[in-house]
Amino acid sequence: MITHHFSDGLYAKESQFSEGMAILKHVHDFSHLSILAKGKVAVMKGEDVEVIEAPACIEIKAGVTHGVKALTDCVWFCIHATDEKDPSKVDDILIGV
């Protein structure tokens, strides 16, 4: 389940996913923060894999290919600086090609 949260100049994408589910590898043009609010995940950044347990906050640098796999049921937030408030447009703006 995805929930979008917006404030002045900020966007938070809340993802709730079950054990075994994954967020596909992707890359952003800008650095951002990700917050693991609940659960345990394996985070892939480039060639590195790190197991993280909530609560945790990690930085994802611009240009780094990354993905997440849930090792337990999880709540994960990606926090981005943007003025865009249309959920149908934020991924197009924030995810690099």
Protein language model regions, located:
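A generic "binding-loop/recognition-motif" signal
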Residues: D29-F30, D48, V64, T72
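Transition segment at domain starts
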Residues: M1-H4
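Glycine- and acidic-residue-biased ligand/ion/polar-headgroup-sensing regions
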Residues: D29-G46
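Double-stranded beta-helix
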Residues: D8-L10, L71-V97
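A cytosolic small-molecule/anion-sensing beta-strand core signal
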Residues: A37-K38, A54, T72
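Conserved short histidine dyad/triad with adjacent acidic residue
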Residues: Y11-H28
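Structural motif
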Residues: K40, T65, D73-V75
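Short acidic-glycine-tyrosine-enriched beta hairpin
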Residues: G46-T65
